Amino acid sequence: MRVLVTGGAGFIGSHLADALIARGDHVVALDNFSTGSTANIKHITKNFEIIDGDIRNADLITDTIKDVDLIFHMAAALGVNTILESPLESISTNIAGSEVVLTAAANHKKRILIASTSEIYGKNPKQPLNETDDRVVGSPQKIRWSYSDAKAIEEAMAFSLNQEKGLKVTTARLFNTVGPRQSAHYGMVVPRFVRSALKNEPIGIYGDGTQSRVFCHVDDAIEALLALVGTDKTINEVYNVGGTGEITIKELAETVIKETKSQSSIEYIPYEKAYAPGFEDMQRRVPDISKIKQNLNWAPKKNLSQIIADVAAHISNS
């Protein structure tokens, strides 16, 4: 099978390419390398082609989609730093780019999975979050929420194209996927903490550290994505994909220090200093993954210690 992976040189996209090739598929990866990296795909030597291009290029996307059997739409402008530093580019990529990809998939009757995000739920205080829960986001003047808004529009476009054109689409809402190749540059907390710990440098926690998350190893997330496109019963459905084991960011920092045998200290950085005045964060973000467990018998296998070990090994060998 020929499979298109948009964002194929990115963190999750490159791991997805590895898994698809391992099962015998030919992967066409499309990436503009704004956040993706050639280092993520340089090890791939067969059944793989890379297209350096932008998902907003309608002619390129149409020509590419015509010749594939399946699409994983992983491309996005993501990460808090990216969103705050380049909000217009983020909004354009996540809305205009996704419209191009989804429309082409509908016109050519291709099966597609879109990678959405737990950011969809915003700051909804109800936890754990299931797929039918409401979005609770801040004011549009707070740029921090623009990524959540853009991904919500992407999901709405996908459902609309299913209704009007029969698009065979499945939506995966990813919760804090972590693992080798994830960059600390875009504000991703685990590689940032691990990198500091390996250097015995202070680990900077934004806020007071009581905010909590649940992390999922990228290998587990990839297994979920492949399972989601392996059956027609997931078409026009949304599935949370995440790990288990809620942990505060302070506890995460302490665990990273312990697992890496680091001499790092912990320092607390006010949100206003890390980002901008008025920045808002979610106090808790915990996925309810009962739907994917019940429907596809999927559950994450790797715990936080394994995640930290794999991230540390990758950083040490890079």
What would you call each of these model-derived segments?
Residues 131-138, 166, 193-205, 259-273, ...:
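A short C-terminal helix-loop "cap" of Rossmann-like NAD(P)-dependent dehydrogenase/epimerase domains
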Residues 218, 272-299, 303:
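Conserved C-terminal active-site "lid" loop/helix of NAD(P)H-dependent oxidoreductases
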Residues 25, 291, 303-318:
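Amphipathic terminal alpha-helices
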Residues 125, 152, 168, 177-191, ...:
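Glycine/proline-rich active-site loop of Rossmann-fold NAD(P)-dependent oxidoreductases
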Residues 221, 225, 241, 252, ...:
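Non-catalytic, hydrophobic alpha-helical segments
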Residues 208, 236-239, 250-253, 261-284:
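C-terminal "lid/loop" region of Rossmann-like NAD(P)-dependent oxidoreductases
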Residues 16, 225-229, 253-256, 308-315:
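Hydrophobic "lid"/C-terminal helical patch
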Residues 1-175:
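N-terminal Rossmann-like NAD(P)+-binding domain of SDR-like oxidoreductases, especially those catalyzing
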